[in-house]
């Protein structure tokens, strides 16, 4: 019986179709998680190879067990996808046939209370995807200025009550440091009007998302990750990116559109003089989303969006 890895790979069949896997190809899973996508990729390889990255060492350990029957075809690396250039150089790989990245926090990270990602379970304020990293949610909450907290909550969480929440956090930490997830969730709740507390989603959801993004620099690493992916794909190679909130999807959409743009000469020019050529072709003009069957089995897939591009 297969171990329960607590993670259902989102948009699995859509990703496999998008990658158009060749049995002898080289593929990269840049956000390994619990290896749900990686397992199905490597099952389709004969002489091919899978390079799987994750900044969470716990994910690497779990994947090492889950992919045990295929480890002769798999290389597991503790690293960020944005460091892909260095990883491939170290491995002596000069081009790959497909890449996958599923952004955001994984289900096991959410479900493991001690990681500090969940507003429903009490734990120290941590939220680090890479537990060897220095910055924690505790430091963000207790040391960042009011203005910086307000900006993070508003920009990364799209939280309309960001000013009130940031102010309440600053008031509480003047009395004593904020140490735990439930303590922070209660502070957030206390800053919100009664009308907001009647909404379907948890009042701390957007704020926790924002702080997590800040701790892990999730938005900052997206553009270099996409540049590294484009640079290392072979012509005809595919890049598939899954995002879980609108901020990331907008960044991915904009970056892929930039990479797909050709001539930028003014329209009145009779011939192109800029010499710019598209680096990728957009396979999906609109993102692919989960169907009703998947949503019934995995409600966390509701916000997932898949975008696909092909190297020119």
Where are these regions (language model features)?
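S-adenosyl-L-methionine-dependent methyltransferase catalytic core, i.e., the SAM/SAH-binding region
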Residues: 1-312
């Amino acid at each position: 019986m297969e171990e329960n890895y607590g993670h259902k790979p989102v948009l699995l069949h859509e990703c496999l179709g998008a990658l158009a896997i060749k049995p002898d190809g080289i593929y990269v899973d840049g956000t390994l998680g619990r290896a749900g996508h990686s397992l199905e990729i490597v099952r389709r390889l004969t002489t091919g190879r899978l390079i799987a990255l994750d900044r969470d060492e716990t994910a690497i350990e779990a994947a090492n067990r889950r992919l045990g029957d295929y480890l002769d075809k798999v290389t597991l690396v503790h690293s960020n996808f944005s460091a892909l250039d260095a990883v491939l150089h170290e491995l002596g790989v000069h081009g790959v046939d497909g890449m996958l990245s599923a952004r955001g926090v994984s289900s096991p990270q959410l479900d493991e209370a001690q990681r500090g990602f969940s507003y429903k379970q009490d734990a120290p304020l941590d939220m680090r995807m890479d537990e060897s990293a220095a910055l924690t949610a505790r430091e963000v909450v207790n040391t960042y200025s009011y203005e910086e907290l307000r900006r993070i909550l508003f920009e990364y969480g799209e939280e309309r009550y960001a000013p009130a929440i940031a102010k309440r956090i600053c008031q509480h930490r003047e009395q004593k440091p904020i140490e735990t997830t439930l303590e922070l969730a209660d502070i957030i709740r206390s800053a919100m009007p009664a009308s907001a507390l009647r909404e379907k989603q948890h009042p701390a959801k957007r704020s926790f998302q924002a702080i997590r993004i800040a701790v892990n620099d999730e938005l900052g690493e997206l553009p270099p990750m996409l540049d590294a992916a484009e640079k290392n794909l072979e012509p005809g190679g595919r890049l598939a990116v899954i995002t879980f909130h609108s901020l990331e999807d907008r960044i991915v959409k904009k970056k892929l559109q930039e990479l797909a743009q050709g001539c930028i000469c003014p329209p009145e020019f009779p011939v192109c003089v800029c010499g710019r050529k598209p680096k990728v072709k957009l396979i999906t003009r609109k993102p692919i989303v989960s169907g009703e069957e998947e949503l019934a089995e995995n409600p966390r897939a509701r916000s997932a969006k898949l975008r696909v591009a092909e190297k020119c």
